[in-house]
Amino acid sequence: MYGRIVYNPTAGPRDAHRELHRVCEELRKRGWKIDIVSTKVRGDAERLARGAAEAGMDAVWVAGGDGTVCEVVNGLVHSQTTMGVLPIGTGNIWAKQL
């Protein structure tokens, strides 16, 4: 199984990066091949998610807030790639409402 974590380093608390690596290690223990990619500018999350879907990755996890989630959703539209959310943003309204 192949997956990607799209991480917004400007979202949420500074210690989220450490937690992100812990999540990644747990996924790897369960047989996932994971890459972590960071966003730098607006639109990166959508582009990175679309690239993962086009590459045939099984899942994309969003590590960020509502804006990052929205971009990844847009990048995965019409794909068969599963999306997961690691809510590390400030508000995380999307994750709370789910």
Pin down the residues of each PLM region.
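Small-residue-rich beta-alpha loop regions that form the catalytic core of phosphotransfer
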Residues: 2-98
